[in-house]
Amino acid sequence: MTLSNPAIAAASGVILAGAYLIDPSALPFVAAGVAATWARVLFKKTAVKTPPMDPKEYRKFKLVDKVHCSPNTAMYKFALPHEDDLLNLPIGQHISIMANINGKDISRSYTPTSSSDDVGHFVLCIKSYPQGNISKMFSELSIGDSINARGPKGQFSYTPNMCRAIGMIAGGTGLTPMLQIIRAIVKNPEDKTQVNFIFANVTEEDIILKAELDLLSQKHPQFKVYYVLNNAPEGWTGGVGFVNADMIKEHMPAPAADIKVLLCGPPPMVSAMSKITQDLGYDKVNAVSKLPDQVFKF
């Protein structure tokens, strides 16, 4: 075994020399013990830790906390296998949740709202529907219950300064992949990407993580958020109704080779936004979005 670390080599030399002076016949056994000890030390330093989540195999993750943020939406916190584990999910990618419901294996994709470098856990924001499958299953979870998850997966992976500007249009929990990207951009002083976000909801109470979004827009001039409500309260200063062409023209970057528009939300909304953006001169949205696409739907 070659000892490349000078301190390790020196310590080993002292041990071997001492053994020789006390009992020369024991030298081979002491040398073997020294070699085995340092082999274990070096192995611990170089061993690669197994990722807590696998892209192909579903694994179980225990629910440790549940916080409601609107009447039908909650944040679900799941523990990773070890306290020092990191999910290390690429920015813009998601995980798959699978459950057996009425004898059928059903899966849905979700993007964690927690950061990929949060230690020991990940958080999912889920809106539950009475007729939903996976979303209803989440609403029935109790602390200590487990889910089956695998990942990462997805065609989008954000890298700093990948384009000059990003326009985002999301509805409800479609916020989650956008939030990942927004956080990554504003916390990196070298990332100069401009971000404009149109966030649509039914009522003001439905706006998920509004306090964080408002704070980010106040602290970081490169990020702007525009809220749209179907049912707006009196005195509301944001958009009212459905996201339309005029809102997109005012709040999104104009079509150009160095911009992207990201869409995420209920299927009818994404379909409507795909048509409006194409009518405004953006590229046509492909059935399955790929990273190079100008308009990408999650």
Curated annotation (Swiss-Prot):
Please list the residues that bind FAD: 139-154, 165-197
Residue span(s) of domain FAD-binding FR-type? 56-159
Q: What is its main location?
A: mitochondrion
- What Pfam families does this protein map onto? FAD_binding_6, NAD_binding_1
An example Gene Ontology CC term for this record: mitochondrial outer membrane
Catalytic activities: 2 Fe(III)-[cytochrome b5] + NADH = 2 Fe(II)-[cytochrome b5] + NAD(+) + H(+); 2 Fe(3+)-[Dph3] + NADH = 2 Fe(2+)-[Dph3] + NAD(+) + H(+)
Per the UniProt entry, the Enzyme Commission number(s) are 1.6.2.2
- Tell me one GO biological process term: protein histidyl modification to diphthamide
Function, in words: NADH-dependent reductase for DPH3 and cytochrome b5. Required for the first step of diphthamide biosynthesis, a post-translational modification of histidine which occurs in elongation factor 2. DPH1 and DPH2 transfer a 3-amino-3-carboxypropyl (ACP) group from S-adenosyl-L-methionine (SAM) to a histidine residue, the reaction is assisted by a reduction system comprising DPH3 and a NADH-dependent reductase, predominantly CBR1. By reducing DPH3, also involved in the formation of the tRNA wobble base modification mcm5s 2U (5-methoxycarbonylmethyl-2-thiouridine), mediated by the elongator complex.
| Family affiliation | Belongs to the flavoprotein pyridine nucleotide cytochrome reductase family.
Query: What's the protein called, per UniProt?
Result: NADH-cytochrome b5 reductase 1
Species assigned in the record: Mortierella alpina
The beginning of the lineage is: Eukaryota, Fungi, Fungi incertae sedis, Mucoromycota, Mortierellomycotina
